[in-house]
Swiss-Prot record:
UniProt pathway annotation: Cofactor biosynthesis; (R)-pantothenate biosynthesis; (R)-pantothenate from (R)-pantoate and beta-alanine: step 1/1
Active-site residue list: H50 (proton donor)
Localisation: Cytoplasm
Protein name: Pantothenate synthetase
GO molecular function: ATP binding; pantoate-beta-alanine ligase activity
Length: 313
């Protein structure tokens, strides 16, 4: 039986691997030289939001950044067109080269699930709430693929955007509950000039819908300003903005604690919205401070002279 050749890695270049074993071998070798392996999981169709995650990952001292590009079929449910999801691998790899990324992991479905989908990670009760109520099985698919990526790459840290906030909370829950030795880093949402959260789905909006979509971020800001008056006032203010755009079909608008438990009487919380505009489903969220005259952890409250808005509408 012949020995397996070491997988090639060229420092300072973009190295593209499809086989999970190749990525495992290369990252293990890099760790042995003192490099810190960090992971940015994506489904491709890269935009400025993804690039912001990559830049945050590159700031880790001694980091070698692994970006995975994999359209995961497990997280698509009935009525969600997996085949229609944008696949722009050549453009994505060009963007990674421009950012100085050294490893791209681009497996096929067969590479990731060679024995089918016989084992999965169950997200628990939170997986059936909020997004999970509208997309049964979605978070089991997300956690399964993220768990596999963390075991394949063995990163010191993995970076995820706060736009998909429930996903971020569930991944942190999984890493804690399954004793996975990776630090999960949340990165603030990247937005367009009018506040719309960057998303691969935004390309499906027509010109009129794109203008209307700005109401989601406007609603979040209205809720954030009203939060000193309590959770009900937060929701009322946000809902009033959304009601001005009848084309927006709201799925949910809720205030929860930062771990998505019941809303606190006072203190740090999260305002979350999901809505459909035409054929496009949009998500957004923002941190709010419920019912307190001072800001969270001593920061100025929204509306105070010292407060800086996260974006302008």
């Amino acid at each position: 039986m012949t020995a397996r050749r070491p997988t090639r890695f060229a420092k300072g270049e973009l190295n593209v691997y499809r086989a999970p074993r190749d990525v495992t071998d290369v990252t293990r070798a890099l760790r042995s030289t003192g490099r810190r392996v960090v992971l940015v999981p994506t489904m491709g169709a890269l935009h400025e939001g993804h690039l912001t995650l990559i830049r945050a990952a590159k700031r880790v001292q001694g980091a070698v950044v692994v970006v995975s590009i994999f359209v995961n079929p497990l997280q698509f449910g009935a009525g969600e067109d997996l085949d229609a999801y944008p696949r722009t691998l050549d453009d994505d790899l060009a963007a990674l080269r421009a950012e100085g990324v050294e490893i791209a992991f681009t497996p096929t479905v067969g590479d990731m699930y060679p024995y089918g989908t016989r084992t999965s990670v169950h997200p628990g009760p939170l997986g059936d709430d909020l997004e999970g109520a509208s997309r049964p099985g979605h978070f089991a698919g997300v956690l399964t693929v993220v768990c596999k990526l963390l075991h394949i790459v063995r990163p010191d840290r993995a970076f995820f955007g706060e736009k998909d906030y429930q996903q971020l909370v569930l991944i942190r829950q999984m890493v804690t509950d399954l004793n996975i030795d990776t630090r999960i880093v949340g990165v603030p949402t990247v937005r367009e000039a009018d506040g719309l959260a960057l998303s691969s789905r935004n390309r499906y909006l027509d010109e009129v819908e794109r203008e209307q979509a700005g109401a989601l971020s406007a609603a979040l800001l209205a809720g954030m300003y009203a939060a000193s008056n309590g959770a009900a006032a937060t929701l009322d203010a946000a809902r009033a903005v959304l009601d001005e755009v009848p084309a927006i079909e709201v799925d949910y608008l809720q205030v929860r604690d930062p771990m998505l438990g019941p809303v606190p009487h006072e203190g740090a919380a999260r305002l979350l919205v999901a809505a459909r505009l035409g054929q496009t489903r949009l998500l957004d969220n923002i941190a709010v401070d419920i019912g307190a005259s001072d800001g969270i952890d001593g920061h100025p409250r929204v509306g105070s002279p010292d407060h800086q808005l996260p974006w302008r509408n």
